[in-house]
Amino acid sequence: EMSRGLGDVYKRQVKDGQIWQQPVREIAQYHKNPCHYEHAEIDGETALSGICGRTMDLTVTMDEQDFNVFSIQLAADEEYETAFTYHKGTGILEIDRTYCGVTKDVVCVRKIKIADPKGLKKMRFILDRQSIELFINDGQQVATTAVCTPLEAEGIRFFSDKKMYITVEKYDIVL
């Protein structure tokens, strides 16, 4: 059941001595309501029509572009969000769930050094109501985070400090 998370639905393989992980192909059988953007312009904070929800398979691909900071805010509304912010100059991806609804004293910010020397090119998110799985650069790195955000917070916002273009592929996951 997806409400328990997707920890057992990874396909693992070894590449160059490292474990890479991806969601299993079978997840595609639950894909509904596709929404696709090719070269969507992001300049400042941007929302894309049809890109929202809390149970989905969302892939964002970035070409080499002139930006310093790119961010995706998931499970978002006026009060809540979980932000995934890439700082291109340092190669750091910051996962910030400060505003995800956490009420206890927990670590809310994690930082990941992107392993690929070419930087962050692709992010695939699997959202499952109260958790987010992120597959970085086709599974070279993986991050999981729990979110306590009310289920009504289903917005997705993109941000870039300079004009850039992304490709977005989104499917609702319906069991």
What are these regions (language model features)?
Residues E1-Y10:
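Single conserved hydrophobic/aromatic residue that forms the stacking wall/gate
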Residues L58-V60, G119-I136:
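Short tryptophan-centered beta-strand motifs in secreted/extracellular beta-sheet-rich domains
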Residues G139-A153:
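Short, solvent-exposed beta-strand-to-loop segments that form ligand-recognition rims
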Residues E45-G50, V109-D116, T145:
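Beta-strand-rich interaction surfaces with strong enrichment in secreted/lumenal proteins
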Residues L151-L175:
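Ligand-recognition surfaces built from glycine- and aromatic
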